[in-house]
């Protein structure tokens, strides 16, 4: 039986964690990015389909390629973040299912239904983005996820000759707490949940 994590771990992962818009000038190493993926890849997906593909942008050149796709409110926070992750989904993720889900012919579930394939890829890559955020927090990093960008521009700039489509962006680094806004409220259990 699994044991609950400590209250301090829950604080790190959830209750004390914040979305950051300002960053300290502390780099995030490539080794740390590999550690992040080594954790997040274990999060569950439908039939283990694992459709997320991630591009970690660490260079000024990469940020300049991304700049035209950013909304004005997301520009400065992204250009100053040590890393910006493009979380994308592979529209042909099912080609890896013989390796990832060898228990049956799962590939045919999706080759016979392009709509199901797209819905599955988008939904599950979104879940994997959440796992990435939790992995960042677990390793002492802060994040700033964003959906305010021009997806077509990102796809043209980074994925033009591939089967990848962008889902969201996540800024990653060590946040500057002095630039945080006051904590915003969340919905109560009664407002957001039901019991049947």
UniProtKB/Swiss-Prot annotation:
Keywords, alphabetical: Flavoprotein, FMN, NAD, NADP, Oxidoreductase
Instruction: Give the GO molecular function terms.
Output: 3-hydroxypropionate dehydrogenase (NADP+) activity
Q: Which GO biological process entries does UniProt record here? A: nitrogen utilization; uracil catabolic process
Q: What class of enzyme is it?
A: oxidoreductase
- Catalyzed reactions per annotation: 3-hydroxypropanoate + NADP(+) = 3-oxopropanoate + NADPH + H(+)
Factors inducing expression: Up-regulated by the nitrogen regulatory protein C (NtrC also called GlnG) and repressed by RutR.
Domain of life according to the entry: Bacteria
Q: Which function does this protein serve?
A: May reduce toxic product malonic semialdehyde to 3-hydroxypropionic acid, which is excreted.
Q: Which InterPro entries match?
A: Nitroreductase, Nitroreductase-like, Nitroreductase_HadB/RutE, RutE-like
For this entry, the protein name equals: Probable malonic semialdehyde reductase RutE
Q: What cofactors does the UniProt entry give for this protein?
A: FMN
Which HAMAP family does the UniProt record give? Oxidoreductase_RutE_HadB
- Origin organism is Shigella dysenteriae serotype 1 (strain Sd197)
Task: Report the family membership.
Answer: Belongs to the nitroreductase family. HadB/RutE subfamily.
Write down the EC number.
1.1.1.298
């Amino acid at each position: 039986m699994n044991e609950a994590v400590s209250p301090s771990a829950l604080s790190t992962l959830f209750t004390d964690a914040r979305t950051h818009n300002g960053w300290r000038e502390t780099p995030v190493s490539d080794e740390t990015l590999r550690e992040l993926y080594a954790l997040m890849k274990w999060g569950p997906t439908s039939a283990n389909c694992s459709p997320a593909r991630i591009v970690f942008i660490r260079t000024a050149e990469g940020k300049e390629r991304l700049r035209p796709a950013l909304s004005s409110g997301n520009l400065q926070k992204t250009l100053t973040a040590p890393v910006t992750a493009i979380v994308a989904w592979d529209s042909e993720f099912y080609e890896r299912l013989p390796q990832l889900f060898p228990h049956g012919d799962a590939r045919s579930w999706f080759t016979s239904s392009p709509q199901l394939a797209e819905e599955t890829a988008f939904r599950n890559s979104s879940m994997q983005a959440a796992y990435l955020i939790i992995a960042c927090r677990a390793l002492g990093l802060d994040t700033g996820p964003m959906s305010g960008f021009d997806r077509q521009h990102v796809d043209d700039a980074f994925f033009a000759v591939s089967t990848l489509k962008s889902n969201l962006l996540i800024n990653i680094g060590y946040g500057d707490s002095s630039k945080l806004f006051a904590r915003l409220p969340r919905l109560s259990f009664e407002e957001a949940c039901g019991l049947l």
